[in-house]
């Protein structure tokens, strides 16, 4: 026992055995914290968190707002207007108003006053109860006498202006009861050249002409049709096409009508040798 106690017993202890328990405890805690930091797995972002949150969320809303705005600002269609109110027959005031609107940006104020037509140059308008034959009989009761006295070529006694060639053929078929033995000429561009119509007007006497304003204007311009003997100019005013448009609702037709009126029609109306009718 004495020999054992005499030895330097602390030298034989293993390394770290002499350290205080407090020190060992502190070092152990530090090591565990480092190990925990190294071993804790870093959370991997999921597929949902990788995608930006604002993607494709705002743009569809803006598109919906834009579509609603354009719907609010859209122009009224003719079908919308007709659905709310019954169609009204055309009146001379309607033609006068269209003329003022058309020439307001092209003429001076003094010149616009010269375009005003007296009420005496207008015939009774169609009240939407007439067929074409019955309307023509009402506005021209002495047609047979006029037809017999007409012998001048390159001219007609009555012009009926419509919007298309198809409509012109319909009008020609519907006026059989009125025209009698009167000669009718088709005045439109479909399948008929201008020169062929000029030669036809030069060869024979014609009483009635039915066609589009563009072709009639071209014939007058080329000297194939003389408007001086003309007594009646009737507009196919109230008829509507598949899009429910009247002839004066179509910009191209409206422009050609006013250009034709300037080629001597207005002066004939003011001299009271020509009457205007709205069918």
Swiss-Prot record:
InterPro entries reported for this sequence: Cms1, P-loop_NTPase
Sites of Omega-N-methylarginine modification: 167
Pfam families registered for this protein in UniProt: CMS1
UniProt GO MF annotations: RNA binding
Region (Disordered): 1-89
Keyword vocabulary terms for this entry: Methylation, Phosphoprotein
Record carries keyword Isomerase: no
Family listed: Belongs to the CMS1 family.
Database matches in Gene3D superfamilies: P-loop containing nucleotide triphosphate hydrolases
Compositional bias ranges of the Acidic residues kind: 1-10
Record-linked PANTHER family: PROTEIN CMSS1 (PTHR24030:SF0)
Encoding gene per record: CMSS1
Protein's UniProt name: Protein CMSS1
């Amino acid at each position: 026992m004495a020999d054992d106690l005499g030895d330097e017993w602390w030298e034989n202890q293993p390394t770290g055995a002499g350290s205080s328990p407090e020190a060992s405890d502190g070092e152990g805690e530090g090591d565990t914290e480092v190990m925990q930091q190294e071993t804790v797995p870093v959370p991997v972002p999921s597929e949902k968190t990788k995608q930006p949150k604002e993607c494709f969320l705002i743009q569809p809303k803006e598109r919906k707002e834009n579509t609603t705005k354009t719907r609010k600002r859209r122009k009224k269609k003719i079908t919308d207007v007709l659905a709310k109110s019954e169609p009204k027959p055309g009146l001379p005031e309607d033609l006068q108003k269209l003329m003022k609107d058309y020439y307001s940006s092209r003429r001076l104020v003094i010149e616009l006053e010269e375009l005003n037509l007296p009420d005496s140059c207008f015939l009774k308008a169609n009240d939407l109860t007439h067929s074409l034959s019955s309307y023509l009989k009402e506005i021209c009761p002495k047609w047979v006498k006029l037809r017999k006295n007409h012998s001048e070529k390159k001219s007609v006694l009555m012009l009926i202006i419509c919007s298309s060639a198809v409509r012109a053929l319909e009008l020609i078929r519907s006026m059989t009861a009125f025209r009698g033995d009167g000669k009718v000429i088709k005045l439109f561009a479909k399948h008929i050249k201008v020169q062929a119509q000029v030669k036809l007007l030069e060869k024979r006497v014609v009483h009635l002409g039915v066609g589009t304003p563009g072709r009639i204007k071209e014939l007058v311009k080329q000297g194939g049709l003389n408007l001086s003997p003309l007594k009646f100019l009737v507009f196919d005013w109230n008829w509507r096409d598949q899009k429910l448009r009247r002839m004066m609702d179509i910009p191209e037709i409206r422009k050609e009508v006013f250009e034709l009126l300037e080629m001597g029609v207005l002066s004939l109306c003011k001299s009271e040798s020509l009457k205007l009718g709205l069918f």
